């Protein structure tokens, strides 16, 4: 049965999108709005929810996840690698984390651009009107707990209207507040709560306040011309 499902998955990605969407909703139980779209990508979480006008670009891999949710008018650009470690398996890894969820939740009007790696062993929650910009950022929710010598994971949260610069690293347990910017090549390794700040450095800290009337923070359409 597993081999049959794998064959179906492989065949489906080459079908015209209207037919492909019908198969994904009927066979896998996915909830995909009629105006949403997935291009040539291997996107097979346990559950997929795509809002109106959301889209996933080509050559995206999203596997071993409990859930992927894209809000309306949100997008995942090409060549993003999105992985996790689903719950409910017989593996000893993360067995002590009973409330863990392997999921990517993206709000409305948000964008993950190109060539990023998102490790969703624990949840990654990205708010509304967020941009994960540039290339080669890594959002890593799991690592090794040196003290206990075992795999451990913690969620990552990116607040509404935040902007994540290129080639950043965000570790499990980190939180970027709403209305904030994470500077390029920065390392975010803890939870912050002060809004309207530029966070930058290795490790990142608040380095400069940002104008609250910045147009990026007040827009009502996610797409930026």
Language model features: what each stretch is:
Residues 186, 197:
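Glycine-rich GHKL/ HATPase_c ATP-binding element in histidine kinases
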Residues 136-153, 161:
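A contiguous binding-surface segment within folded domains or other stable secondary-structure elements
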